[in-house]
């Protein structure tokens, strides 16, 4: 899900090179003759098709969420695990269908376009809900930055450990602290945070997509190889047995597994941005509905394979993060490639999620203190080899670095990949994937209160709220249990 970059870049590139036509981001659009190269909102003609949209969605979905799926299925077992995944995919499919009707406010063919998820909420549901949606979305982005810091440091350590195991022939347990690796990742992100519009560099999304497919495919392949070597499918129908874990742990872990699976499917936020790259006619929503069906089918099959093979390979001992659980020591170079791919992917994906927060903070501050020199003054520094000087703004430098330091410190305080992923999945799933799309659809299509359709939509929403709450509680309980055993800043693996 980290590769939302793909969608973003595509969108930004519509108008970054063509500042002249960037009228749509303001409120007025001069009347224009129907040129062949522009759309009805004065932006350059969109060229996306069902296939480009599907590709964007697939790259936006398949990401670090894959890594915890085997663990999630291990908590739920062979019956409930795949069933829950199927359920999430169906809910996501349905809510994506509702969302695709919200790209244009009012009329599906000629209504005003909404360029992002937040635009749609603002224009359909109004100011108050827009603020709440923003709060949840920025919290989610902040949480993802923390989750990615943890995941990246775990993968860096995994490379170090696998080489250490290899050297000592498996005799040395190779315990180490994750802190130095989090700090290295943090320093890299502080530097990248200073690059303006980093999330709009076109090749980032391609790199992210290639990397996530690399490590997902390696994880899948190693799972299949391990199953073949074992000669049996491990695991049980009801998941991890009581005895291995206590009764209460089993309940918490089951709840947390729901959050982990929800996280793997949480990408509805980028759907409208992807829809904004699609050409019309036919109506964008039609193309998008096809694309959603294709991409959700592909990702669900892929997730089922990764999760099931991981569980079949390790049974109840399935690691929380498939590639770093050390179920595989050999071929160690292949594991290193997979973990390096994760790190490269997360370094870029961190920025894709952090930059919108930066943009939001900068905009809010500029509106509040328009005349403050400290906030707006830029110093130019000439960098040898670069044509244009680099502009330094003290405020930007200070608070962006502060943001990265905050996420790094929180990661060191609670470096539990699964728990954090579960919390994020729970936080984002109900409001962003279900509640807002349902509310927007009801408002858009003027669904009558207490009509059958209205009641069904509200029941779906309430059911998903319950799942979100349960997953959140389970994950928070997981953090509490982990913190009993773990001393902050002293984590070892």
From Swiss-Prot:
Inhibited by diethylpyrocarbonate (DEPC). Optimum pH is acidic. Keywords: Amino-acid transport, Cell membrane, Membrane, Symport, Transmembrane, Transmembrane helix, Transport. The keyword Transmembrane helix applies. GO terms for molecular function: symporter activity. Amino acid-proton symporter. Stereospecific transporter with a broad specificity for histidine, arginine, glutamate and neutral amino acids, favoring small amino acids such as alanine, asparagine and glutamine. Also accepts large aromatic residues such as phenlalanine or tyrosine. Has a much higher affinity for basic amino acids as compared with AAP1. May function in xylem-to-phloem transfer and in uptake of amino acids assimilated in the green silique tissue. The keyword Hydrolase does not apply. The lineage of its organism: Eukaryota, Viridiplantae, Streptophyta, Embryophyta, Tracheophyta. Belongs to the amino acid/polyamine transporter 2 family. Amino acid/auxin permease (AAAP) (TC 2.A.18.2) subfamily. Residues 1-49, 92-138, 197-200, 275-293, 362-396, 441-458 are cytoplasmic. This is Amino acid permease 2. It comes from Arabidopsis thaliana. GO terms for cellular component: plasma membrane. Highly expressed in developing pods. Found in the vascular strands of siliques, cotyledons, leaves and roots, in the inner phloem of stems, and in the funiculi. Lower levels of expression in flowers. Not expressed in seeds. It is found in: Cell membrane. InterPro entries: AA_transpt_TM (IPR013057). One of its GO terms (biological process) is neutral amino acid transport.
